[in-house]
Amino acid sequence: MTVQWQVSDAELDQFAAKVADGGEVADGMRQRAKRAFRLGMIVYEDAIIGTAALKKPAASYRTKVFKKAGSQLDPAAYPYELGWIFLDVPHRKKGQMTRLIDDLLPAAKGANLFATTRTSNDIMRGMLAQIKFSEEGTEYQSDQNPAETVKLFVRNAHQTEASE
């Protein structure tokens, strides 16, 4: 497992392709991955089999997400987003993704974080709960797949410190 700030072009291509495998990609994924604060990758036999990222999204994006979720929280208080989380099916349920995320989170230096996931993604919802994220607001329609709904999760720095 690696957490990187800078990646090669080949790694960036593999990262973007793996995120696309998870069905979470929109146009411009490679460029957005290039701008991410930190990229995390799980590599097996020289291939990326899992991805996660710590992002510092624009204020306008954070405001849009929190508004869609009907959240009363201040989006400015959540500067980091945990996202682009995907792991190939044969490698799931082995704790690898939790370890990768545990390696990524210290880069946020204790700041509040948010994440979104499809409401139907029970595995991701469970993992977010396991790493001390809580559901916030109401589910809302996915921009990428109108047949799906999305749920906002937040992790507050003071709650994390109190529970550790």
Name these PLM-found stretches.
Residues G50-W84, S142-P146:
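Conserved acyl-donor/pantetheine-binding loop and adjacent beta-alpha core of acyl/acetyltransferases
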Residues A108-T119:
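Conserved GNAT acetyl-CoA-binding A-motif
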Residues R35, I42, R125, F153, ...:
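Extended, composition-driven regions rather than compact fold-specific motifs
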Residues M1-Q31, L39-I49:
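Short amphipathic alpha-helix that is part of the acyltransferase structural core
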Residues W84-L87, K93-P106, G126, Q130:
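Conserved acetyl-CoA-binding loop-helix of GNAT-fold acetyltransferases
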Residues Q141-E164:
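C-terminal "cap" of GNAT-fold acetyltransferases
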Residues T119-S142:
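Conserved active-site alpha-helix within GNAT-family acetyltransferase domains
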